[in-house]
Amino acid sequence: MKLKNMKNKILFWVFYLMVSLVVAQTQTTTVIKDMVIKEPYIYAIEEKGTLRLWHTATLKEIPIAYDTQNVFTAIALDRKQNVVVGTKEGKLFYLSENGLQLFKQLKKPYTIQHIVFNSQNHPYLVIPNALYSPITDTYWTNFYHNYSPMIVQKRYLFFFKKRIKTFFLPPSLVFVDNNDVIWMTSFYGEFGGTLQLFDSKERKIINTPVENLKLGLFFPQSIFTDGKTDAVYIASGIQHIISSGDIFKIQHYTAEKILDDKDRPLDERLFIGASTIDAATETLYIATQKGIYQTPLPKSGCITNIELLCAPQLYWEREPLAMGAKMAIKKLFFHNGKLFFLTAQNGIGVYHEGVINYLNKP
């Protein structure tokens, strides 16, 4: 009995120390929410809403003058490569060496969560519970969900509720393809993911399902393109008891799995995260729990071999809706021979010629 009590005490203190370590790590780490690259600078916003700036060549931080009254919540490049930032109070600004210039102020102070631009350079915003066009002052919410990891209900006759399939789910990833289709997706741990499509040129919701894409087994980590074709690529991965991941190539609303981690032995499977393609060399870069891999992008068929490029040592946190960790790398960018990676807890990393540097160390 005494040994059992002692074992319980040891387990308690181990758990306590682990929780304390995670809390301390979270409290001392500056979290970068998003970033864009426009030569000669790297622009980033923190989770707490402040703006940061680094030089792409020297990787040194540069002081920037901006209105400290604003809480920045989104950042993007428009089609003319202007840096645009959104705020918690529903304001859009152009950002340049001359500071902030007000571009648009929403009629209501909705928090701007994501910003994208179509080929006509028209902005589309994700605000709470809607996709919104500030140009036409129009919003869209009626996206059809044949499958959803979330149960959404609508109240009727004051007291009754019924489950509905037409609604808007806030996405974690937003991407505009070469045909001006806005791809919005997110996932909810082991329960799978969602996909919402919108034609930004015709300004209408697309309810066409993507064939061969099972949303219950869909865990989107990034959306990207090869820079040459109309194909859309989505990296999907989760760590739930075991690591797993896939990369889909989608054309004409049909998904083809070009990387299937089930082809690997169980103990060698990879938790696939953010990915990107260097269009010049047609090289695919893939973030995993073991490091960043590279492989030639196949013209057709599946990826057969991947090579470990680098293995950054990163902090991680637990995935709340699965038995495992969150992906530590949120975004990958290949720019002028350097691989930039936006991390969840370690700021922005840069890999170049075998060396890793960090722009923001905890």
Language-model-derived ranges and their functions:
Residues 1-31:
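Bacterial Sec-dependent N-terminal signal peptides
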Residues 45-46, 87, 127-128, 184-187, ...:
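Recurrent small/Gly-Pro-centered beta-turn motifs in extracellular repeat architectures
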